[in-house]
Amino acid sequence: MTNHCLEVGIVCAWLRATRKLHFSDMMLDMQLRESQAVGEHRPDIVVGNLAIEVELNHKRKETLTRNVLSNELNYDGQVWLVPQRKANIRRSLAEIFSDNVIEDETAKILCLEDIHQELCLCNIHNNTWQAPPLP
């Protein structure tokens, strides 16, 4: 199992614990693969009409741009979760959002470690902590 798969699982647990979403409310990229053409971009997680991306490794700016624009076209919003130490990825995403006039209300970049911390603060047995809404 890759680090990416583990992080996607952690994000699903975070969505469950902090947003009170059921796992059936989340579509993962492997589920989306069944209904999309080969080579078409799929977000890591889709909740409603929100694309959630876990970005652990630097990609060419052209690839990131293609993925951001695909999300912009196909979803009402997108959230990118990036490790703190990967400032180059966050910087590239911010430039892509700016260059393509993507609104702050529809596109967010969050620190993956903040997700970990929020999940650790949750009482997962009774969901006593409620996070602010996603875009």
At which residue positions do the language-model features occur?
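Non-catalytic C-terminal interaction segments of nucleic acid-processing enzymes
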Residues: 58, 62-77, 81-135
